[in-house]
Every structure is written in structure tokens, then in C-alpha cells.
Regions:
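Short, positively charged patches
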Residues: 1-145
């Protein structure tokens, strides 16, 4: 499980505009952790992802701290909420088999279920009201039937 400092480092790494997941993956492979990526010199990061992507760390976007506080509030806002990074023991093995697994997972509920046989409902980050209603209805129906 990530502590508060590790979560902030992961969040900053993944929310840096212009870096992308591929850039984040390369930096993580080179430096070992999100915290070490942020502690690395600009020159060291440039060697891994090139100058334009490395420069993305020079300025922190204004909205980053607002989004970070919102994510932290979500984490502290209910029982069973946590964040798993791709190296976490509880990270779902099946996701590691996909071409581009998420580097962070926001989880609510019992993490031990993540490695059981399951069904995923995949949607949009910007779902319509109807789409959200449909997802809730599908989820409720499926959970009632095991």
C-alpha cells in the first residue's frame, strides 16, 4: 500500500502533462520508483525520455494540487479505499497481461477479489448521465447474480 508521500509522487508522475504513461513507464524502469523519478536530476530524466518530456516537470500545473487534494479526499472518504501501484502485491495479475496496464488503480472494496475470476464493466471517463445509470444497473444486476 502506498503511503501519502509515495501516492503524491505517483500522482505527480502520472499527472504531468506531456509525459504520458509510456514516458512514465520508461522513467520508472530507469529510476525504480515514482519518488526516485521526482528526485532525479533534469539531466538524468532527459537521458531517459528526452528534453521535451523531461521539461514537463519544470512547472507544476495549477490544477494539479486541486486534483491531488480531491484524490486524497476520496481516499480518506470511505472504508476500503486505497490505491495500488503496478508493483503492489495486490495488483491484479490479469491486468499485467494487458498491453498497457494502468500504473495506478483506485480501489474501493475488498482487494482480495481483484485476483479472482471476474467481469469488468468498462466505460468512459466522461460518461453521460444515461451511461452512468446503465453502468449502475448492469453492476447491480450482475452483483445480485454472483
Amino acid at each position: 500500500m502506498l503511503d501519502a508521500d509515495d501516492f503524491e509522487a505517483w500522482f505527480r508522475l502520472l499527472e504531468t502533462p506531456g509525459l504520458g504513461r509510456e514516458g512514465a513507464r520508461r522513467l520508472l524502469a530507469a529510476f525504480g520508483s515514482a519518488t526516485q523519478v521526482l528526485q532525479a536530476s533534469k539531466a538524468a530524466r532527459q537521458q531517459v525520455v528526452g528534453p521535451p518530456r523531461a521539461q514537463a516537470f519544470d512547472t507544476e500545473p495549477e490544477e494539479l494540487s486541486t486534483r491531488l487534494r480531491a484524490a486524497q479526499a476520496w481516499l480518506g472518504g470511505g472504508e476500503g479505499r486505497r490505491v495500488l501501484c503496478i508493483g503492489d502485491d495486490a495488483y491484479p495479475a490479469v491486468l499485467l497481461q494487458t498491453p498497457d496496464p494502468p500504473l495506478l488503480l483506485y480501489v474501493q472494496g475488498q482487494v482480495e477479489f481483484l485476483n479472482r475470476r471476474s467481469l469488468a464493466i468498462v466505460g468512459s471517463r466522461n460518461a453521460s448521465a444515461q451511461g452512468l445509470d446503465n453502468a449502475r444497473a448492469f453492476g447491480a444486476h450482475l452483483s445480485q447474480h454472483g
